[in-house]
Amino acid sequence: MKILFIVDPLETLKPGHDTSVALMQAAARRGHSVWAAEVGDLQVHHHRAAAQVRTLTIHPGRTPFYTVEAVGFYPLSEADVIWMRKDPPVTSAYLWATQVLDLVNAGRGDGRTTFVLNRPSGLRNDNEKLYALHFPDLVPETRVCTHRQDILDFVDIHGRAVIKPLDGKGGEGIFLLARADRNLNAIIEASTAYGTRHVMVQRYLEESRQGDKRIVLLAGEPIGALLRVPREDDVRGNMAAGGRVVKTTLTERDREICRVVGPRLVADGHYFVGIDVIGAYLTEINVTSPTGICEIDVLDGVVLEDEIVDWLVEYTRPALARNL
């Protein structure tokens, strides 16, 4: 198969950490052609989705992990699979790229279908913070708002809260709110851009000191997990914010959460997803570019990326003759 990965600049990807690299390596091990492009390479040409594409040779255990063998301009329908793994934030350029990806199978008459994951319309519609609110029985007390007084009222009710930007990643812009903090008003002003930008405010969960659990789901089923434990001087467990990763297992509550959200994820076209769980609560659903595969491999002695690529092959085998 020809698998096109739409990613950040290749030179910024880190082998041993970036899930996109692990997936490319697994695809190459399985004998598939690995292509790469950036969001800026996508375009519509003669009414067809197309891109400037790099054909890669993947080098396991080497830096850089790839060689660009060729650069060519192709209709995106030339790929058998397109994997959209551009990191957030979801900018206007990102949204435009999903519109281009909607056109991949438009007007083709060859009986084939290129599989695009996650589904472009789902990437547009399902904000990674707000998506979890479709499951009100699973999430902690939450308010999404812009006004300072609404946030202060929430803090008064719950004692402490966490404020998050709706378009952040890797723990960026996340702060702990407490009435006793003399910086409280300044944090709210900065987070909301003086009341002009919506934020999410959630009840602070004491269990977050023990870590937040990243659970990776493939086609709605959990295939691995890790625990991200924050530093003593931080409330964020994200790896990008200095959190450490710890081996973990799924509790019955974790499995219940997966059973509830899994069918909805698949229905919305989200086949590869990372959900975040703190204690008994779902806090986030990561659909754009979920990570954690490399760390789970090391912690659990597995090779999840091989399992994922094998699933992809089996799932898309009939896709050449059916409409996904």
Curated annotation (Swiss-Prot):
Q: Which GO terms describe its cellular component?
A: cytoplasm
Q: Which reaction does it catalyse?
A: gamma-L-glutamyl-L-cysteine + glycine + ATP = glutathione + ADP + phosphate + H(+)
What does the record give as EC number? Answer: 6.3.2.3
Q: Keyword check for Manganese, yes or no.
A: yes
TM segments?
none
Q: Which UniProt keywords apply?
A: ATP-binding, Glutathione biosynthesis, Ligase, Magnesium, Manganese, Metal-binding, Nucleotide-binding
NCBIfam families cross-referenced by the UniProt entry: glut_syn, PRK05246.1
Which Pfam families does this UniProt record tie to the protein? GSH-S_ATP (PF02955), GSH-S_N (PF02951)
Pathway noted in the entry: Sulfur metabolism; glutathione biosynthesis; glutathione from L-cysteine and L-glutamate: step 2/2
**Which Gene Ontology terms cover its molecular function?**
ATP binding; glutathione synthase activity; metal ion binding
Source domain of life is Bacteria
Q: Where is the ATP-grasp domain?
A: 129-313
The record's comment on cofactor binding reads: Binds 1 Mg(2+) or Mn(2+) ion per subunit.
Q: Name the family the entry cites.
A: Belongs to the prokaryotic GSH synthase family.
Record the organism.
Gloeobacter violaceus (strain ATCC 29082 / PCC 7421)
InterPro entries documented for this protein: ATP-grasp (IPR011761), ATP_grasp_subdomain_1 (IPR013815), Glut_synth_pro (IPR006284), GSHS_ATP-bd (IPR004218), GSHS_N (IPR004215), PreATP-grasp_dom_sf (IPR016185)
**Cofactor(s) listed:** Mg(2+); Mn(2+)
Q: Which HAMAP family match?
A: GSH_S (MF_00162)
Residue sites binding ATP per the record? 155-211
Enzyme class, broadest EC rank: ligase
Task: Name the encoding gene, please.
Answer: gshB
Please verify whether the record's keywords include ATP-binding. yes
- Recorded protein name is Glutathione synthetase
Q: Which residues bind Mg(2+)?
A: 284, 286
